[in-house]
Regions:
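Conserved MFS/SLC helix-loop-helix module at the cytosolic interface between two early adjacent transmembrane helices
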Residues: 1-26
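Juxtamembrane intracellular "pre-TM" segments in multi-pass secondary transporters
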Residues: 115-143
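A generic transmembrane-helix signature of 12-TM secondary carrier transporters
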Residues: 12, 16-19, 34-35, 101-108
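Transmembrane alpha-helical cores of Major Facilitator Superfamily
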Residues: 13, 36, 67-75, 79, ...
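Helix-loop-helix hairpin linking two adjacent transmembrane segments in secondary transporters
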Residues: 26-30, 59-61, 68-113
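Cytoplasmic helix-loop-helix junction between adjacent transmembrane helices
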Residues: 28, 34-72
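Extracytoplasmic gate region of multi-pass secondary transporters
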Residues: 140-179
Length: 183
């Protein structure tokens, strides 16, 4: 039967599969498909893990549990992008994705061990309830701020390395240091 643990492990498997496809993609189209699979899995995983983090602690500790969980995302961004750049510069871009697969496997094992088994998936949500979310101005503003904030950060990461190396002539090792400082 499906419970939150089964769902989390399955989604982590999809994340790993997407990154494996990206690592060994023979064409740009398959690389994009792998990236889309991994990103969808990541978004779903973060959403569900937020709820699980809140549910496995006492009510007065929920905010701290969620904050701790998002600290992991922040650390992954601060360390992961420069580390991926470093791996790509000293090997090739494929190895950056292989490294993500290894981290994903560690996450899958940790999820299998640490997430409690008896956490059922909550009841079904009707579409009218979901539609109400998109009519709430405060929620919409929070969603837009989050999307544009993270989108802007990752867009900057996309162009930062080529600009630093091409325009400003920084060495690859200096770019890694700059990315760590930016993160």
């Amino acid at each position: 039967t499906w419970n939150r643990k089964t769902l989390m492990v399955s989604i982590m498997g999809l994340f790993i599969l997407g990154n494996l496809l990206s690592a060994f993609a023979p064409t740009f189209l398959l690389l994009l498909v792998g990236r889309v699979l991994a990103s969808l899995a990541h978004g779903i995983f973060m959403s569900i893990s937020t709820v699980i983090a809140a549910d496995v602690v006492r009510p007065e500790k929920r905010a701290s549990a969620i904050a701790l969980m998002f600290t992991g995302l922040t650390v992954a961004t601060v360390i992961g992008v420069p580390l991926g750049t470093f791996i790509g510069q000293h090997s090739n871009w494929h190895m950056s994705f292989v490294f993500i697969v290894v981290i994903g496997l560690i996450g899958l094992i940790a999820t299998s061990i640490l997430v409690p088994k008896g956490m059922p998936i909550p009841g079904k949500i009707n579409l009218s309830g979901l539609a109400r979310i998109f009519t709430n101005k405060s929620i919409l503003m929070s969603l837009f701020i989050t999307a544009f904030g993270y989108g802007g950060t990752f867009a900057a990461y996309t162009y930062l390395t080529p600009i630093l190396e091409g325009t400003f002539r920084f060495s690859a090792s200096t770019v890694v240091i700059i990315l760590v400082a930016y993160g």
